[in-house]
Amino acid sequence: MAKKVFIAAGHGGKDSGAIGVNGVYEKNLTLSISKYLAAALKRCSIEYQMSRTTDTDPVNTVAKCNKYKPDVAVAIHLNAYDKKVRGAEVFYSLFSAEGKKFATSVLNNIVALGVKSRGVKTKKNSNGRDWFEFIRETDATALLVECCFIDNANDYNFVNTAAKQKIMAEAIAKGICEYLKIEYIAEAPKPTTTTNNSTKLYRVQVGAFKDVNNAKALQDKLKAAGYDAIIV
């Protein structure tokens, strides 16, 4: 039976999330990365469900996740603080040893891109439970992934284009595959086409004779057939 992953694209709709370099909204980046992540998982024969596929408010995310009954769940987020802090961090449940393993696998693959590691972490609320609702209320082993700090120019450089958002998503997909013990299948390279713009000309020789009359006879035949022919 295929493994199942729930992908929560952080924020959305009226909730822009963090605001980064050039006024970029976290909600737009999380959606883009989540879509690329979904495509990567599909390529690896992993089933998935997304919390949202358009810019809509994040409604009933946990309920959707629990109804789907995934093997694991991942919430995609991006950080912001004071424009100086950098790095990726992955949160998991206080009460889940498996969560720590899962978080470590995902973080290691993000860090392999060159992002600074801020570690795998837990966060406790005043009641001694998990701080993040997504981690606290989700039945499956769940992570909240903070890919980088988008208000830091160096960190934002890891996600500032669609191509880089795809690279980030692929790193997360690798981490998921490693944890689920499923082979990660890289995207096949697109075939390239080449155009020959060479102006080089090639000559074709037909026949070689000791008797010039024989050469002239062949020349006449070639010209009669519509070919240019010279004797050298």
Predicted regions and their residues:
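Catalytic-site neighborhoods of secreted/periplasmic enzymes
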Residues: G13
